[in-house]
């Protein structure tokens, strides 16, 4: 069974599986069906449920340890300490890190220390180059894969891992799986071409990238 739900849809499905005796080991969720709110209320009843994971979780990464040490241990945390390092918390950290790195990347081209415009930050977002060495230096070891973005590729990565709920926390697998771009790229191109045509947009040229 593939869960494609959002919010309470997932925990409801897992509770029904428990009630009917359907093996949770045979249930797989898309990445947005694989966070703590989806399984926490079901607890042991969701044990064995699998879900795709775009990012790691847990309190082991250095970036998470720094937040615990410099924020929560000093009594300056504004949210529950036990949520630090959860799937959604970590995803939020990644988003903020990418935003900062986009500004940093833009400043490399347009002037270090200067205030960047929206267009300049867009260039930074479209020219990210985060290799493993950089991710480790930022404290995001084992959190995400290296990524490189471009004007034509805003995603930068099409890889994910599979995580399994053990009744209390997520156990993430070591193997990464890549989406089949031979299937996805034509679909993305067709969708973007239609959107551009419907909205009467002009295609960006290389100079704008």
Map each language-model feature to its residues.
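Extracellular/periplasmic periplasmic-binding protein-like sensory domains
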Residues: 17-96, 191
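Active-site proximal loops enriched in glycine and acidic residues that flank catalytic Cys/His/Asp
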Residues: 5, 29-33, 53, 164-166, ...
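Hydrophobic alpha-helical
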Residues: 1-20, 95-102
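Segments of small-molecule ligand-sensing domains
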Residues: 78-89, 100-174
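Catalytic-loop motifs flanking and including active-site residues across diverse enzymes
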Residues: 6-9, 63, 91-99, 158, ...
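Conserved C-terminal helix/tail region of periplasmic/extracytoplasmic solute-binding proteins
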Residues: 120, 125-133, 164-209
